[in-house]
Regions:
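Aliphatic-rich helix starts adjacent to a transmembrane/signal segment
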Residues: 1-38
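Low-complexity, Gly/Pro-rich coil/beta segments used as flexible assembly/activation regions
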Residues: 34-169
Length: 169
């Protein structure tokens, strides 16, 4: 009788440990994904709103040609500017549009200085930038805000989305 009770107890403990090991691995990957997202978001948030925005964002580009006008007011115009092929050359938020690095992308996962990231094997980073419309009260211009969606795909295939808006200020 004691052997049967002991066998049942050991089976239950073994299953519990197995489940904790599996969930612990997922938690570890999620933590690494969040660290990776924080790194990319910090890098992107530090950039200017637009190619024609001054460093610091004041005064904002105003969407008119010449002077301090924004470069374009359409989603088709977003993405790296001419000559900005490497992330180290990106100088405004929309340069990151369509960035795709890491596992399955064909591009290495890099840090802000262009060095290959270690410890993030099988992670993938994708960035989409779009105009988010008039979310700022100063005008009806489509160029008031850009929406940045950062997607981190973990080794298990689960994707985490991180979103922020960059205002034209």
């Amino acid at each position: 009788v004691v052997i049967v009770i002991l066998a049942i107890a050991l089976t239950a403990v073994t299953q519990m440990i197995g489940q904790n090991t599996i969930s612990g691995a997922y938690t570890y990957d999620e933590t690494k994904a969040i660290e990776l997202a924080q790194s990319y978001l910090g890098e992107i948030k530090a950039k200017r709103y637009d190619e024609n925005s001054p460093v610091g964002g004041v005064p904002p580009c105003d969407g008119v040609s010449g002077g301090n006008g924004c470069t374009a007011n359409s989603n088709a115009a977003l993405g790296p500017d001419t000559g900005e092929l490497a992330r180290t050359a990106f100088d405004d938020v929309d340069d990151y549009d369509d960035l795709d690095e890491g596992s399955g992308s064909g591009n290495a996962l890099l840090d802000a200085e262009g060095n290959t990231r270690t410890g993030y094997e099988n992670f993938r980073v994708q960035v989409q930038v779009t105009y988010s419309g008039n979310v700022a009260p100063r005008s009806g211009s489509v160029s008031d805000s850009k929406k940045v969606v950062l997607t981190i795909t973990q080794p298990n295939g689960e994707a985490l989305d991180f979103t922020f808006h960059r205002a034209n200020y």
